[in-house]
């Protein structure tokens, strides 16, 4: 698999404190379904707000390329820690890819420096020796299925199940630390996971803005 494809843009928003204040003024909802609650976690705002389009415009400028999004995107995500997280699996991060949504992803960290913990990590699956999911119809996928005597659905199910087994199934390739007003833009086929959950309220919880898009 080829080298990681990550762009880091610091000082992303010209006035990040205004973005943070706006994000904290919005209403957050719990995950819409059990699957999202189990794997992605956190509370979301609507993507229908001014900073969604502003953020997408800044991403296009950073890439110096036009971009396309197929659905409203750019919501804020708030992730908190609670004493009620009794199950370790409920607290754990989950290694995954987002290629089914769009080819590229971006997130903006909106916590002040004094709160910044962890970041976003990228991994290689040990058994498959992949750092990203290949095209289902690629020769690479066909070779793996033949060598391991499994079908494509078996590959996808394995990746999903292994997502919580970080120490046993994955090798860490790199970590992009959280920093206030830092934007990470990356190929969403790459295996990645958030690192660090903190805070009990909106004022000190992990706050990000999330985007999925394609490049024209």
State the predicted function of each range:
Residues 1-185, 189-216:
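Fe(II)/2-oxoglutarate oxygenase catalytic core
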């Amino acid at each position: 698999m080829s080298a990681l494809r990550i762009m880091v843009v610091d000082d992303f928003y010209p006035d990040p404190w205004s973005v943070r204040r706006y994000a904290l003024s919005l209403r957050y909802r719990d995950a819409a379904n059990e699957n999202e609650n189990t794997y992605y976690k956190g509370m979301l705002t609507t993507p229908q707000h001014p900073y969604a389009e502003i953020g997408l415009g800044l991403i296009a400028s950073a890439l110096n390329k036009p971009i396309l999004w197929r659905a409203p995107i750019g919501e804020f995500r708030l992730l908190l820690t609670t004493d009620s997280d009794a199950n370790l699996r409920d607290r754990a991060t989950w290694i995954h890819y987002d290629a089914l949504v769009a080819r590229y992803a971006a997130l903006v960290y909106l916590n002040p420096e004094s709160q910044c913990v962890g970041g976003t990590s990228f991994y290689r699956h040990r058994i498959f020796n992949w750092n990203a999911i290949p095209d289902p119809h690629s020769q690479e996928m066909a070779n793996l299925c033949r060598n391991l005597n499994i079908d494509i659905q078996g590959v996808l199910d394995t990746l999903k199940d292994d997502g919580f087994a970080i120490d046993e199934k994955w090798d860490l390739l790199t970590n992009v630390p959280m920093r206030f007003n830092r934007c990470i833009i990356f190929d969403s086929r790459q295996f990645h996971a958030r690192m660090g959950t903190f805070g009990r309220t909106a004022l000190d919880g992990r706050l990000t803005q999330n985007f999925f898009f394609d490049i024209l």
